[in-house]
């Protein structure tokens, strides 16, 4: 145990006494297995606890919960090869005697299981003192010669159940293969069986150390937790999408049908995957889903101290092993990595505990436990869980012939870097906690202090979050998509400056994406360079890829089929609207005028059924000539009556990208499920049309829709504004503008992950933008700067205008043919280069006996298997400077110690202040000492901790500090109370891991304090923009369905509710993986 850690009495982690007894499963109707009654004698013997320095025999630390955990190990773990299991034996002399005791106890437990639960427990309790005395008096036999009692235990079959009856819960309940347990036993030799039982000692020793931690958990929770943590068969990360066939998934995470009764939480029931026939007929998909859900809840409910101390215990064990492997470079690097993991975990635990202690003060209400502090703690716990799983895998397989040293070292280094940066973010959050007023999430202080805080924050290293650790905090089903997006992004960025368009860029990116797919470190460094240095025009071009005709057509083929999907062009003509206070009076609604003068507004009408008015001549005259007219593809159907409802939708895209076409797939589903026509506004985009052009167009289209709702197939009785991200911002501002004009306000608003604060203010959730692959901080700042009217570079090419359309086609064709040749050659050369390096390293002579594995030999080599010319050994600074050129063999190697990476000085970043003030601010900053910088990072960090700094100079990352960002029609959160009181009922659907989460929480808090009807639902483990990913996985579909339910509350309020609809419900959604 680490010095300074507290020792807690045994009563803190003993299983709960109120457990139902386990009854044998009978043939016929399926029954739910439950836990066995605890033996009072066993509990009494385990109540006493000695100091950690007194090493007791291993069996004296065993509990019934661990017997269950050990007895529920997968059969696949018992089928390991003899050589692999031999290496799993511990190196310490004391625990080598415990396998004998363990085998005898397991043999007696199997015999007792045939006599009944109560009798078996008594027999074990009576014989345990004698066994302990025998253990102390006589040394245990070596691993090669088992004692007679052990041989008898090995000769006993693993399962002696009657034919047709199910096995006892103490035996493995499921098999990972199609063969029966009897066949599996026949294929395993006696030597393998002996060594398999001996190999389980490592897991037993790990669980024994876990008992010394502060925990109070039931036996079933201990069993599920121990099986998840000790799953060393699969090398993939926790919850990875490739875990479908892993033993933890196929072997059953918990007993089928058992409710995990977490303290203070509602039970989570894992349904059985079979219907009374055979456990082998369950589908792997359902097992995979159950494993992910259970592992996710274990992460949520696992005690933070338990997780940290478990990780520290494993790290110390790995340090002791690799330190004894000689002076090899790889062994030293592995020892250094685990030392860093131990240091960062111990430093992070108290900081996370402090944040958790006050996080509830920033929630909307007790039923809605969501804010940036909680999200930051959850992200850190996810990183600790991944390191815990990876450390356990290394501890169990480090001497195996199949152990990939280089791969596991790279994984550990990446997650250690992520953990280090997360610790820095936690210290930032503590600084915000001290500075902000109680209950306020956004920093409120002097703008100079805010600038200094964000300038220091933006210089943190980010590449580690975009390589191997990409999206580790999100649901596993969405991580492959994020990897595809990141590879496409960095490949697209290489060809952005070449002024290519269309198919040429896509083809070039395809051929250059190979090296980024092979090398995650290079991909992360390039991702960081692009996000910090490329301007908003790049992001606009990249996000608009979904607007291509080919991609949009494919998306529409997979979406629901609707009768009406038309692109309309609203003429820029003023019209009158009646006032709500006095309908006899009217107000003139002028067409949009800002920046570019009067112009038409494009809207898309979507309706599942053809309704009255939608095929009128007046509406047909507004159809844009090149717009979709899906109505013409259908024979003229019978018209449906006008709907009572109308949905006005504003799409997202950061105010700079996308149109209604990108969001059409889920809008079609909305039209089908809600039975209401939808009108989606294609507002003008920044930077060509900054604020307030988009607001003017959206308000003009909203008023036009109210006045001409009959043409849209609606009576206009209920009108709902809906939008996501930037569209959510427009929902609030349009409603505020309607109230200011005195015209009809909508009946309700559904905003998904809206941006309500565009002012450059720090908040705990916005700290997550450091690692968010879809909404990095630099991208957020550039989008807001463009919408606020900041000057951007003009990338319009006069040569393209002179070429014309046919000239562009000919030029792109020539570039495409050239890229086919150069791209294929580059990709093949990079692949052959990496293969050649690997073959050269493998051909080096290994002066070791044949009994040693390749990994063992690599640990002892003076020059490890990762040569100094490998990309894995380059620092991220070297990778960024390397670019497309070749790196010489004398490139310095990657060292993940904080002392090596911290000296890199951050470059000055013009993040908040205008360009003319950046130089003076930088000079003043350099003159100040660390203690005089107020919110400076070095003053916020404890002594000895140094986060990693980015080597990329973010010279093009200004956030326009114009006073316009404080305009309530741009930042609704800053609106005065009188304006917020004019809003209709608001329904917000936010993401717990979204950098914009605090925007939603603070707006909901303000509306709640004003007595306004508001609901807040927070979905877990999903990124910003999940609506456009609705068809990707089950979690995104459930989140999209939640948005539909919120809209339905506006269109059809529940019976008994007033015109404001639902007023009090708020919470964190559990159907989408939320906290229960």
Curated annotation (Swiss-Prot):
Recorded GO molecular functions are: all-trans-retinyl-palmitate hydrolase, all-trans-retinol forming activity; diacylglycerol lipase activity; monoacylglycerol lipase activity; retinyl-palmitate esterase activity; sterol ester esterase activity; triacylglycerol lipase activity
Residue stretches of biased makeup (Basic and acidic residues) = 65-77
Which tissues does the record link to its expression?
Answer: Testis.
Where are stretches of biased composition, namely Pro residues? 140-149
Give the reaction(s) catalysed: a diacylglycerol + H2O = a monoacylglycerol + a fatty acid + H(+); a triacylglycerol + H2O = a diacylglycerol + a fatty acid + H(+); a monoacylglycerol + H2O = glycerol + a fatty acid + H(+); Hydrolyzes glycerol monoesters of long-chain fatty acids
GO BP terms, alphabetized: cholesterol metabolic process; diacylglycerol catabolic process; ether lipid metabolic process; lipid catabolic process; protein phosphorylation; triglyceride catabolic process
Tell me the InterPro entries matching this sequence: AB_hydrolase_3, AB_hydrolase_fold, HSL_N, Lipase_GDXG_HIS_AS, Lipase_GDXG_put_SER_AS
What's known about how it's activated or inhibited?
A: Retinyl ester hydrolase is inhibited by bis-p-nitrophenyl phosphate.
Q: Which positions bear Phosphoserine?
A: 853, 855, 897, 929, 950-951
Q: Identify the stretch(es) annotated as Disordered.
A: 1-198, 229-250, 838-930, 1055-1076
Kindly provide the PTM information from the record: Phosphorylation by AMPK reduces its translocation towards the lipid droplets.
Please list the residue ranges that the record marks as compositionally biased, kind Low complexity: 150-161, 237-246
The active site lies at: 725, 994, 1024
Q: Which disease is it linked to?
A: Lipodystrophy, familial partial, 6: A form of lipodystrophy characterized by abnormal subcutaneous fat distribution. Affected individuals have increased visceral fat, impaired lipolysis, dyslipidemia, hepatic steatosis, systemic insulin resistance, and diabetes. Some patients manifest muscular dystrophy.
What is the stated purpose of this protein? Lipase with broad substrate specificity, catalyzing the hydrolysis of triacylglycerols (TAGs), diacylglycerols (DAGs), monoacylglycerols (MAGs), cholesteryl esters and retinyl esters. Shows a preferential hydrolysis of DAGs over TAGs and MAGs and preferentially hydrolyzes the fatty acid (FA) esters at the sn-3 position of the glycerol backbone in DAGs. Preferentially hydrolyzes FA esters at the sn-1 and sn-2 positions of the glycerol backbone in TAGs.
The entry sums up its family as follows: Belongs to the 'GDXG' lipolytic enzyme family.
Protein name (Swiss-Prot/TrEMBL): Hormone-sensitive lipase
What are the top taxonomic ranks of the organism?
A: Eukaryota, Metazoa, Chordata, Craniata, Vertebrata
């Amino acid at each position: 145990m680490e010095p300074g850690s507290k020792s807690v009495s045994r009563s803190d982690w003993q299983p709960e006494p109120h457990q139902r007894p386990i009854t044998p499963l009978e043939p016929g109707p399926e029954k739910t297995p439950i836990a066995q009654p605890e033996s009072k004698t066993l509990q009494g013997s385990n109540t006493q606890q000695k100091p950690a320095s007194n090493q007791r025999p291993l069996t004296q630390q065993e509990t019934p919960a661990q017997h269950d955990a050990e007895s529920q190990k997968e059969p696949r773990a018992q089928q390991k090869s003899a050589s692999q299991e031999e290496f799993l034996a511990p190196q310490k002399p004391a625990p080598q005697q415990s396998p004998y005791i363990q085998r005898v106890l397991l043999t007696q437990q199997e015999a007792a299981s045939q006599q009944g639960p109560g009798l078996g427990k008594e027999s074990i309790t009576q014989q345990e003192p004698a066994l302990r005395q025998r253990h102390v008096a006589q040394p245990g036999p070596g691993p090669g010669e088992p004692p007679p009692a052990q041989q008898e235990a090995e000769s006993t079959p693993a399962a002696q159940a009657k034919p047709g009856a199910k096995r006892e819960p103490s035996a493995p309940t499921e098999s990972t293969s199609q063969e029966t347990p009897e066949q599996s036993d026949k294929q395993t030799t006696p030597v393998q069986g002996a060594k398999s039982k001996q190999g389980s000692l490592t897991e037993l020793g790990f669980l024994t150390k876990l008992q010394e931690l502060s925990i109070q958990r039931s036996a079933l929770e201990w069993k599920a937790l121990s099986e998840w943590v000790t799953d060393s068969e699969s090398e993939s990360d926790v919850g990875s999408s490739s875990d479908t066939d892993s033993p933890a998934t196929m072997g059953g995470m918990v007993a089928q049908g058992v409710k995990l009764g977490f303290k203070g939480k509602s039970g989570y029931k894992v349904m059985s995957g079979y219907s009374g026939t055979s456990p082998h007929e369950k589908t792997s998909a359902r097992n995979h889903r159950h494993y992910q859900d259970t592992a996710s809840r274990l992460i949520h409910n696992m005690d933070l101290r338990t997780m940290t101390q478990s990780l520290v215990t494993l790290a110390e064990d790995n340090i002791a092993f690799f330190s004894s492997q000689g002076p090899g470079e790889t062994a030293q690097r592995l020892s250094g990595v685990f030392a860093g993991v131990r240091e960062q975990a111990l430093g992070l635990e108290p900081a996370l505990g402090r944040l958790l202690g006050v996080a509830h003060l920033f929630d909307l209400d007790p039923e809605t436990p969501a804010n940036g502090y909680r999200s930051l703690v959850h992200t850190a716990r996810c990183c600790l869980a991944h390191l815990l799983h990876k450390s356990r895998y290394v501890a169990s397989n480090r001497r195996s012939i199949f152990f990939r040293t280089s791969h596991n070292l790279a994984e550990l280094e990446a997650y250690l870097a992520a953990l280090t940066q997360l610790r820095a973010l936690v210290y930032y959050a503590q600084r915000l906690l001290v500075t902000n007023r109680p209950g306020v999430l956004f920093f409120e202080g002097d703008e100079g202090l805010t600038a200094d805080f964000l300038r220091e924050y933006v210089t943190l290293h980010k590449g580690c979050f975009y390589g191997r650790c990409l999206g580790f905090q999100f649901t596993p089903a969405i991580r492959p998509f994020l990897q595809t997006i990141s590879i496409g992004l960095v490949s697209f960025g290489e060809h952005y400056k070449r002024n290519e368009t269309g198919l040429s860029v896509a083809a070039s990116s395809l051929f250059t994406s190979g090296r980024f797919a092979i090398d995650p470190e290079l991909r992360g460094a390039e991702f960081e360079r692009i996000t910090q240095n490329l301007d908003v025009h790049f992001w606009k071009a990249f996000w608009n890829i979904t607007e291509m005709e080919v991609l949009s057509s494919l998306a529409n083929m997979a979406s629901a089929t609707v009768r009406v999907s038309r692109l309309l062009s609203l003429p820029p003509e003023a019209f009158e609207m009646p006032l709500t206070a006095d309908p006899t009076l009217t107000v003139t609604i002028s067409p949009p005028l800002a920046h570019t003068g009067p112009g038409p507004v494009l809207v898309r009408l979507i309706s599942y059924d053809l309704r009255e008015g939608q095929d009128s001549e007046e509406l047909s005259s507004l159809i844009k000539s090149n717009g979709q007219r899906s109505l013409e593809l259908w024979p003229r159907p019978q018209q449906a009556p006008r709907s009572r409802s109308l949905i006005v939708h504003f799409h997202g895209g950061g105010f700079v990208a996308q149109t209604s076409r990108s969001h059409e797939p889920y809008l079609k589903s909305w039209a089908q499920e809600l039975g209401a026509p939808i009108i989606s506004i294609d507002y003008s985009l920044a930077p060509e049309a900054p604020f307030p052009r988009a607001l003017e167009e959206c308000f003009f289209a909203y008023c036009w829709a109210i006045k001409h709702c009959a043409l849209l197939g609606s009576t206009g009785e209920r009108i709902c504004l809906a939008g996501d991200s930037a569209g959510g911002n427009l929902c609030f501002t349009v409603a505020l503008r309607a109230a200011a004009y005195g015209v009809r306000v909508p009946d309700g608003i559904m905003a998904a992950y809206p941006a309500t604060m565009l002012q450059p203010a720090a908040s705990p959730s916005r700290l997550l933008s450091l690692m968010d692959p879809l909404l990095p901080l630099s991208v957020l700042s550039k989008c807001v700067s463009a919408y606020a009217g900041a000057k951007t570079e003009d990338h319009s090419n006069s040569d393209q205008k002179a070429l014309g359309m046919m000239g562009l086609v000919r030029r792109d064709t020539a570039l495409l043919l050239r890229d086919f040749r150069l791209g294929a050659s580059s990709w093949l050369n990079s692949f052959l280069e990496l293969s050649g390096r690997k073959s050269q390293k493998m051909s080096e002579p290994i002066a070791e006996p044949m009994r040693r594995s390749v990994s063992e030999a690599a640990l002892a080599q003076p020059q490890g298997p990762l040569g100094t010319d490998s990309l894995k050994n380059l620092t991220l600074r070297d990778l960024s400077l390397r670019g497309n050129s070749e790196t010489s063999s004398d490139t310095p190697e990657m060292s993940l110690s904080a002392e090596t990476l911290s000296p890199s000085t951050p470059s000055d970043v013009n993040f908040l202040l205008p360009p003319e003030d950046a130089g003076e601010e930088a000079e003043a900053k350099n003159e100040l000492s660390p203690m005089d910088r107020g919110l400076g990072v070095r003053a916020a960090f404890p002594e000895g901790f140094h986060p990693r700094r980015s080597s990329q100079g973010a010279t093009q990352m200004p956030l326009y500090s114009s006073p316009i960002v404080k305009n309530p029609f741009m930042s609704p959160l800053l609106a005065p109370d009188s304006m917020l009181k004019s809003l209709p009922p608001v329904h917000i659907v936010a993401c717990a891991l979204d950098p914009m989460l605090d925007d939603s929480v603070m707006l909901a808090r303000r509306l709640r304090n004003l007595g306004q009807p508001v609901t807040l639902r927070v979905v877990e483990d999903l990124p910003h923009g999940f609506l456009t990913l609705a068809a990707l996985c089950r979690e995104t579909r459930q989140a999209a369905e939640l948005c539909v339910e919120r809209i339905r509350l506006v269109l059809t309020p529940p019976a008994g509710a007033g015109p404001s609809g639902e007023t009090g419900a708020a919470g964190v959604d559990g159907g989408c993986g939320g906290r229960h």
